[in-house]
């Protein structure tokens, strides 16, 4: 029994590695990775576009149902802490949406920039970097923030940009986006 479990795990790990992926709970279809259950809607959309949906219903089986309340009335500001990295494609696709949230809701935006992973000496395998870029691009297309060119401000450019925060922030701990 134990050897069968080990065999199944080894086979799954091999398939995952062959797909150039780095952790479990992902879905893979036709050379496209989906990074967990919050990406199932993309897979369903793709299968529907291909005409593979068996049900005549137009209802989604895996809808992404994240909805903000129509009215959020509060005398108190809600703290939202945002951790952007200058090298992250997720920062590119989220920054404008974060600012819109701040505009539309009683939010006290606290921006806490983080150094890019590469500047923190983190090893990033090529397949992980490729996945992050492709996932962020897919997410960006969904929200009309198409990624065209990629700029990677590692090292001195990042340090200079982050140093400006000392002059633009109301306090050393908080910063504006």
Question: Where are the model-predicted features located?
Answer:
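A short acidic, helix-capping loop that chelates divalent metal ions and anchors anionic groups
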Residues: 118-123
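Conserved helix-turn-beta segment immediately C-terminal to the redox Cys motif
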Residues: 99-110
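Local sequence-structure signature of Cys/Sec-based thiol-disulfide redox active-site neighborhoods
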Residues: 76-93
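Non-catalytic, surface beta->alpha helical segment in thiol-disulfide oxidoreductase systems
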Residues: 33-51
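Thioredoxin-like thiol-disulfide oxidoreductase module
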Residues: 2-21
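Conserved small/polar residues in nucleotide/adenosyl-binding loops
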Residues: 167-174
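Short, structured active-site "lid" loops
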Residues: 128-144
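A short, hydrophobic beta-strand/beta-hairpin element that forms part of a small beta-sheet core
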Residues: 25-31
């Amino acid at each position: 029994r134990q050897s069968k479990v080990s065999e199944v795990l080894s086979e799954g790990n091999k398939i995952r590695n062959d797909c150039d992926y780095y952790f479990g709970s992902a879905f893979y279809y036709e050379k496209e990775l989906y990074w967990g259950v919050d990406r199932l809607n993309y897979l369903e959309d793709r299968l529907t576009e291909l005409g593979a949906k068996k049900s005549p219903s137009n209802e989604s089986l895996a809808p992404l149902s994240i909805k903000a309340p129509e009215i959020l009335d509060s005398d108190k500001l809600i703290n939202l802490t945002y951790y952007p990295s200058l090298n992250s494609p997720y920062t590119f696709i989220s920054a404008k949406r974060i600012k819109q949230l701040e505009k539309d809701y009683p939010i006290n935006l606290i921006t806490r920039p983080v150094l890019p992973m590469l500047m923190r000496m983190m090893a990033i395998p090529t397949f992980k970097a490729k996945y992050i870029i492709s996932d962020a691009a897919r997410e960006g297309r969904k929200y009309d923030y198409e990624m065209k060119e990629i700029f990677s401000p590692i090292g001195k450019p990042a340090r200079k940009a982050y140093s400006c925060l000392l002059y633009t922030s109301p306090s050393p701990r908080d910063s504006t986006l």
